[in-house]
């Protein structure tokens, strides 16, 4: 149904330069999905200009930079990034002109609060964080984490790569985050493989809205138009983002509804824990506890005993006709394999995959 909606002639035959009076349906799509995702994110404004997740990160961190610059607080030159973060986080911060400060994870795989307290100061611009994090654990100290950063005058950026685990259950805005990106091409049922197209929707709190890339879609008396934020960072992509992806995402959101979105997240968590339970007696879990939507196995012991590495196992998966999982990531886990079944896999498929892992 997502593909059918995106293929409707009324959408595929649009041109971004045609008069907005003749594109009211398209603007309604942008406005409606922005409102729906704002509710899921716990944010007050959403833009679809960024073309992918890392592009969304770049946009979000530019919002943080614009906020501090606008206030004359130019001493805030550092962005804090945990050592378990996605590699795009430090790259994004550096591209935005910030110095990256890495802080270690604790023994539980979560942010080390003492290390965070030691890292923040008058030069802290913000923190970039994923929750649940890259090892599939929800950081229960998240409110304390965002408070530490806010008390130091910094802002908190939510990397929404793992939003699939918590959407409809808890909102990043309620965790204390000020801005967020979400990969529509990952979490909201749009194409993820084949090179795209992607969409890295960015949401922010009201106080950051004036820095958002313009134009934003607004509605007045049933008519849709554009509004340019007064202190906008400027465009980050031509026109209004990858619109066909937005159509697919809106179809997905409206089809599932609030309860369906929550159920999708809960099923993703259930599936990951099912596979973790089936594999934990054969493989070493990096963190042997209830996970969220993904978990990480370490093949260090297997490698020492047999010489079989994570790479070898991944190649073996190909021999069985299965795509291998993410390898050697996150970097804090040696000989890592990351397993993320998502909400759509059946028990039969997961059983088959687990059996192949164990055979290998």
What role is predicted for each listed range?
Residues 7-21, 39, 94-103, 123-128, ...:
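Gly-rich Lys/Arg/Thr-decorated short loops/hinges at beta-loop-alpha junctions or inter-strand turns
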Residues 12-51, 56:
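Conserved N-terminal alpha-helix of the aminotransferase class I/II PLP-enzyme fold
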Residues 22-36, 331-360:
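PLP-dependent enzyme catalytic core of the Aspartate aminotransferase-like
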Residues 179-300:
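Active-site C-terminal subdomain of aminotransferase-like
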Residues 284-319, 335-351:
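Conserved PLP-binding catalytic core of the aspartate aminotransferase-like
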